[in-house]
Amino acid sequence: METELCLAAGYIETFAGNGKARSTGDGKRAVKAGIPLPHHAALDREEQWFYFAESGSDRIRRVHLQEGTVHNFAGIGETCYSGDDGVCGEAGLYLPLGVAFDSRNNLYICDSGSNRIRKVDHETGIITTVVGTGQHGFNGDGPAREVNLTWPAAIAFGTDDVLYIADTQAHKVRRYDPKTDLVTTIAGTWTAEDDAREQPLVARNLVVLSGDAIGIDFSDDQGWLMPVCSDGLDMSMYLDDGKPAMDARLYDIVGIAVDSKDDVYVVDKGSNRVRKIDVQTGVISTVAGVCRYGYDGDDKPAVRAMLHAPEAAIFDRDGHLYISDTMNHRVRKVDGKTGMITTVAGNGDSGYEDKNIGGCGAARFVAKESAGQLKHGDGLLGIEAVVNSPVGLAMDSQGHLYICERGENKIRRLKLS
């Protein structure tokens, strides 16, 4: 068995990918295959196959967990939309980013560039569009195939096969109910004024805050002080905890997860936070991050810890939340009981120091063992290894965390304690 698991708790290995940015190796060992820009991932219900969106080739590929071989599943390797009502392996995908399984083992694909959510029937392999017209720009709620999506980036299922969609460039979270075939909005508002506020402000009269809270305050045209990040971006529109989620500004939501209570968590890369939408009350709150980007350590409440452009989140069966802290090159864990944040993978380095080698290219220093062998970090503790720009996360029933390492074109596997 190629992928027989022998990792000790806390250690990391390469599960798939040779680090090269060209899609290769169908039918061969996954660790020898090229998997350009793996994004989000999921395991099927039987945990026979591991599926991932290979955004660099516009395909969905899968790894057989027992044999360790990789195979194409959906997409033809061309950036296009085509093939509805046909076999998924002959359909065109346009920047697929998200994948998720419903209770019947049907695979749903977030076909971002075509502004659609597509479904592959488990029994027949036929692909269809279930949400989206193909047009972008918010046009309200209603029947699923009459509703526009705008570059959706992630999907996740709740109970009763209700699908939650990160409608990224519409700055909204959408809810698709397959029983009624209706799409509704559960979070997010955005206006033309909000677009203007994404630009750095110019200081006229300013007051420097004491300490290192958010940054500095700029006076707007009405004389109000606005909390601003150190890079000049207006953060005032994000200070909406405790308010209805429908009134919240969601800047760049690129990840989504659902907990055991059916509450929805969105990863807002643009505000460097993970937000929680309480489905009973409709109220939004922050569970990790402080708006400002950076890294200021672990072992503190997650709501006081800095994140840097996080892109994904997932829950384990004990209710702990794992976050891809992408530009901090770490995977973080938020304890479900205490709310404290720690790192489970990644030492914070983006991946080694590049050196010129006399006009012949560049060499990468990885890591050196006492025996003089170079390593990427496999076989090390997860917190000692380099994890370069982690994005999508998946979890199996044995407590293994799968990490799509976009910066290295690999998928890593970590044995959780």
Segments from the language model and where they lie:
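Gly/Pro-rich loop segments of beta-rich domains
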Residues: 2-37, 68-95, 126-151, 181-252, ...
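Conserved beta-strand position repeated across blades of beta-propeller domains
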Residues: 34, 39-42, 97-100, 153-156, ...
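Residue-level detector of Asp-centered blade-edge/turn motifs that repeat once per structural unit
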Residues: 43-47, 101-104, 157-160, 258-261, ...
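Conserved beta-propeller blade signature
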Residues: 49-51, 106-108, 162-164, 263-265, ...
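Short loop/turn segments immediately following the C-termini of beta-strands
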Residues: 55, 112, 168, 269, ...
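Structural signal for beta-propeller blades
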Residues: 58-61, 115-117, 171-173, 272-274, ...
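Short loop/turn segments that connect beta-strands within beta-propeller blades
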Residues: 64-68, 121-125, 177-181, 278-282, ...
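Blade-level signature of beta-propeller repeat domains, shared across WD40, Kelch, NHL, RCC1
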Residues: 388-417
